[in-house]
Amino acid sequence: MDYLTTFTGKSGRLLRGTASRLWGLGGGGEARQVRFEDYLREPAPGDPGCGPGELRPPSPTSPEGPDTGQKKTLDKKDGRRMSFQKPKGTIEYTVESRDSLNSIALKFDTTPNELVQLNKLFSRAVVTGQVLYVPDPEYVSSVESSPSLSPVSPLSPTSSEAEFDKTTTPDVVHPKEAPPSSTESSIRPARVVSSTSEEEEAFTEKFLKINCKYITNGKGTVSGVLLVTPNNIMFDPHKTDPLVQENGCEEYGIMCPMEEVMSAAMYKEILDSKLKESLPIEVDQLSGRGFCHSKKMTGVPAEETDSRSRDQGNDSVSTAPRSTEESLSEDVFTESELSPIREELPSSELRQEKSSDASSESVQTVSQIEVESLTAASESADVPDHTNANSGRSSSEVGALSHETGLSSLEIATKEGDKATGNLQEVSGPKEQSTDIKGQDNQDSFHHENSLQQEAGEDSLSSGETVELTEKPTVLKDQQGKELKRDSETEVEELRKLWKTHSMQQAKQQRDTIQQVAQRESKHRGAPADAHGEGSSLLKEKRRHRLHKFLCLRVGKPMRKTFVSQASATMQQYAQRDKKHEYWFAVPQERTDHLYAFFIQWSPEIYAEDTGEYTREPGFIVVKKMAESGPDEAPAGEAAAREWEITTREDINSKQAAPAKADLEPESFRPNLSDPSELLLPDQIEKLTKHLPPRTIGYPWTLVYGTGKHGTSLKTLYRTMTGLDTPVLMVIKDSDGQVFGALASEPFKVSDGFYGTGETFVFTFCPEFEVFKWTGDNMFFIKGDMDSLAFGGGGGEFALWLDGDLYHGRSHSCKTFGNHTLSKKEDFFIQDIEIWAFE
């Protein structure tokens, strides 16, 4: 075996380890001598190595089998080298001739990344006949198979060497060892690791997939799928939608990176009057106008709540990657899989369900329920625990938990987390945490409630039974004591998540308080309670499943079209750079809470890596807009319509700095003119300056052509442009006294075709100032001939056209700028022209 030492690296270690197991030390302590022969024969008694005291090669009838048996074992081992244990919750699928990884993922409602992770593929290429593991659509997770979603998950070893040793150890060498049964594997202590390997973690993505409607500005409303990931937001229209079949997917497929999202707000109705007019009737009727969504659960019996919590299972936001041996089908948020996340507690009483293993509970759901329970208990501190009967109180009536209280509870729990005594202790089996932290008598009592999934045949505690933990350590059972050390880190980690979701809960309390006030005002206006009666309750019951809320995404740059080429998408993005970048989606009401939780979960990290201390500014913050009542709108109209808003700190700072900037704008936007303008007033110059390209700011305006100075000739105009290398501004005054014109990105010249860039735009002061910038539909900016000068084009019409004598002109709407007629009449007579350069 000396030649085996020549192999180095990982493969050498595996080869030497396998050889030592196959041909290691014999029972007498002597090394087994193995001869490799090209043919099989019976050894003679006199052959060396076959003496009485030495081991003989096994005969064909021996239990160990002959050399051919070893060869078959090696072949079998080599076949196993690329295989692994079948993950739970999966089925086998054989790749067909026209299959690709994307088509297979689409067929089984998963993602290509999950298939790569599930099958440990090295590339996305698949071949015909290849067997892949795909999620089983009929798989129902159980206690043994459902993965734990805690930040510190007990995972099986993912090392490739350990996996190779486990799968390739032949039965002939270790006949006493057998694969562990499912019962043994479920009760054996698992190795605690922080996460999966980097290779597996790179493929793990969480996302929301929501069926909604995209409300465009002037191009109708289409249905499709809104895909929200930690990195991007994308909308794909349904091909069966009538508008998509009529206009194509190019108009409606959009996406943008998450870092460009300035704010995301949820409204009960659309505030933009133009969008509201284009809203379909069915969406407008289901928008919930006048119906306040306070998310109350008044009068819900305990049995219904328990059954609802059991149905929820693992359907909540995941916070940590999972092992490849576990089911990945629950990572995806779909309409059919995800039940609404509970936000309000129907009772301040603590109910616990005892189960053998509660690893299937999600950390996000646990933390969220814990925060809500903390909030509910903070108001009812003066009521004893055994007399709390306000089962129908919603969080909007309770109020927000104070910041100081949350900090103090976090500090206490963090200090006691390592000891796992005092404020935190294990109640039942591994990873089951139902705690009640009591501080002082008749003061703030905090209830942590876990609605754990209950299996058939398992005992459960009564709904009124509570387990109270005092600050004195209690003696745990032997089994609990063994789990205590392992769960202490998990408790501290969950407290981090608890504090993280606490800030989210505070914002919800503010939002619900606004809605509560609006409800009370509407009731106070004289609507009798009897008038609502059964009809109102039935209507609300119907609307609960049919209502739409309106998601408004404000982005820094226009969203990119996904069904057009990269060049066209970039061109259209640039054309819409100065427009209002708001995108509206009609989202089902039951998915609004999922969106809120997702934005909070996947916003930039606000915690340190190893501690629960607040160290950085949040990437997204929840704000309440203090809008002043304008002359046209009712006070706090937008605040009443808005459900919630998540925005960036930069966006808030820019809004707060807007008034100060507005005061400085008149001075900063007054350029220096080489000659006084006879066509533009000072306020008109200021308005124009705000829309000029950035490369013109700071340069004085130089008059390079004027009909009063140079005459009315297009050829003279071209001659005065010679040698210029700046944008030029043309201002025209017609015989009706109307002022309009165009900004050209390049000086005017005679050209064979259209020239210019997207900086070109047309404007008019008739009757009010309007600027029409490039729409991105085409690139017909400027066209210069010896007998005419034109701006814009498409469909045979120009936005602005001048003849060779600079006497007659014409203006039409065109696709290049999306403008209307710049003058009062389509045909006009030119009275005066000024052309300004910036140099």
Swiss-Prot record:
Residue ranges of domain LysM in the record: 91-134
Taxonomy, superkingdom: Eukaryota
GO MF annotation list: oxidoreductase activity
Boundaries of every GRAM domain copy: 206-261
Chain intervals with Polar residues compositional bias: 357-378, 387-397, 502-519
The family this protein is said to belong to: Belongs to the OXR1 family.
Protein name (database record): Oxidation resistance protein 1
Protein species of origin: Rattus norvegicus (Rat)
Lineage of the organism: Eukaryota, Metazoa, Chordata, Craniata, Vertebrata
